[in-house]
Amino acid sequence: VTAAAPTAPAAGPGRVPGPGPDPGPGAPAPTGRLALVLAPRGGRTVAVRQFHAGALRVLRPHRLDGSGQPCFVVVNPGGGYLGGDRYELDIAVEAAGTALVTTQSATKVYRSPAAPARQDVRLTLGPGAVLEYLPDQLIAYEDADYVQSTTVSMDPSACLVASEVVTPGWAPDGTVFRYRGVALRTEVVMDGTTVVLDNLRLHPAEDAVAGLGFLEGRTHLGSLLVVDPRVDRALVEQVHELLAAAERRLPLLRCGVSELPVPGLVVRALGPGSAELTELLLDVSALLRGRWTGQGRVALRKY
């Protein structure tokens, strides 16, 4: 896969550019848009700018521990994504800020007969910023077609931990892989240069997604992307040992870890269900949190 490297917008010292521009005159409004700019104030990270429109909202942040890190929960009151829908999510964390962002529930994609449902996610991290982006699973139902583009512009000193779990939704005949397509593209940019590019494409009607080289008899897929200057070979080996132990406990799991060209790692896991994969990715996250910040395992409270 090849892609042109975008140029990061200019920003003042210790600050990050704000969320992406509004649609121009005559451009169709997105189905839902949410923009957050987060910055440290008085030892805690707070939202210094917040905007939402259409079918995206964010709940008042709560604190999961005493670290001062806020947890923001993104909500879609519409309940699901339909063909032709377009969502935009912009999150910027300024220098030394820290935040955890999740969703209130799974992202449910329904029939998309004419056009795919799309979501554009733009994450911006300033120097020393920390963002844990841990949404609930993506569920693609029968005839669903979903395209997601995630672009991360981050300072080399920042920390990103981002997860994704893809789940085949229920179909009337009880079979799996009845969705039309799931395409997830993630690009990480540092100093105007693309340093990580991951392009995941699942099209059951065109590819034998259940076969060798794809899901290999499993139905669910999980990924965890970590970009942080503290990642080294020893940490990658620790993660590998954690994954190997998980495979011994749960024989239906298949998982691995790879080191990135920049300090970072990516975990890919196949399994029989979203719960097993979510727990596995949170186990890896807990290892990183314990080593880097002394925080405990993420225990999300959702209402």
Where are the language model's segments positioned?
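A short, polar/proline- and glycine-enriched secondary-structure boundary/capping micro-motif
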Residues: 57-60, 110-115, 143-145, 171-175, ...
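N-terminal, charged/glycine-rich beta-strand/loop interface patches
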Residues: 2-137, 142, 149
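Broad gene-expression machinery/nucleic-acid interaction feature
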Residues: 31-35, 69, 86-88, 118-120, ...
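Structural motif
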Residues: 98-100, 130-132, 159-161, 222-223, ...
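N-terminal intrinsically disordered, cationic/polar leader segments
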Residues: 2-5, 15, 26-33, 37-53, ...
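A structural signal for small-residue-enriched, beta-sheet-centric alpha/beta enzyme cores
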Residues: 166-303
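Short, structured patches in soluble enzyme cores that scaffold and shape functional sites
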Residues: 93-95, 103-105, 125-127, 135-137, ...
